């Protein structure tokens, strides 16, 4: 639908619609020559929703298109085959970091906060289904200093966790999560630490600078109980933790909270300590291993050969470096292993979120979770020193001076999929027209080579959804074909479109 406040945009959209109609008419020339009165609309009506690169269209409902009886030639054709099926779709989400929760709870009025959370998680709105929850401090902490749930003086320890408390989170993190849960009880919470308590580490500090922050040999059992206490205490507050990873980006050398945890040590921790402790406590969150970049995809391959692999539900990946095809490689080796993208942040990611979504789901991800749900205009508050995410943006931007919230390009990119593909949907066959690149943050190429990329799903109700993204510098004309019928569409450079039909 055109925005009356943007007449120029309406004229442009109308022109584009005329082009599509004209192109569709070309398909029917042969039929007209045989005496037909016009294009035969032999297929279902197709809903069209589009977001442009410059946000001149933002989840805009454009005029419907219709399948006609002929398939065009000399165009890229997205042939949808619903007889060939792949992984299930679990949903999309973002992280409720300490910074995000603080901004939502303390910098917005109650009505503004309710509007934002409803817009993000309401089933009639964006319908996000995942919230990633850092266990204590991450690189985005409103306090500006690291903390854990069991802090003691340097040189001391608390192996019985007598001082354990999630009281810090009671101020604003848990209230924000409770509001999310109230909007949609089906939202799933995934939790993991950036660092255990400092006394559990060889450097007796939160950071992992130069890889010095390793888990002490006598801290494996206390760390397992740390997870048990966290899950129980959050559960008592109405937040059921459905999944965990043992460690965010294990081995990444950081000045902010981090832990040097090798594949062997992570496998040992899961198999001998974490999984048994959770079972004894009657807790059954799904455990995901790894939680790091595609670039280090050899590490999950080593992990799945370890006996600990039987204790985990899947592998969590980050988008910042490497090739999305690593997920497909792992699937080919261990098809039962679920795969999710558990972190990706616009600003330092190799490409836009629309490109990530297509690449991730084409390569066997069941879920994609972006990084911060909300940040301020400066991309903070951050946990200094934080040079690793100094250009990060969030799904929502909070203006602390005006106490207002606005939605970023990530919001609309997520909506192009989350509003139309339901949890339990299944990816179905469709071709793509790009190859996937090996990336290195913003210094590398985009996720994929320039061209048309797409992914298709069938919802539990039988409806079909195609998400197409134009990763090129000019508009692309293409066709969508299904069961012998097709329609033609022209997609502007950098734009994303969603097609939905019964």
For each feature predicted by the language model, list its residue ranges.
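N-terminal secretory signal peptides that target proteins for export/translocation
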Residues: 1-15
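N-terminal catalytic cores of secreted or lumenal carbohydrate-active enzymes
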Residues: 57-241
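Substrate-binding and catalytic surfaces of secreted/luminal carbohydrate-active proteins
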Residues: 43-80, 189-191, 224-242, 253-502
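C-terminal motif of bacterial Sec signal peptides marking the signal peptidase cleavage site
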Residues: 30-33
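Short, well-ordered beta-to-alpha junction loops that form the rim of enzyme active sites
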Residues: 136, 192-194, 246-249, 292
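Sec-dependent signal peptide recognition
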Residues: 16-24
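Bacterial lipoprotein signal-peptidase II cleavage site
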Residues: 35-40
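Active-site-proximal beta-alpha loop/turn segments in soluble metabolic enzymes
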Residues: 204-216, 249-262
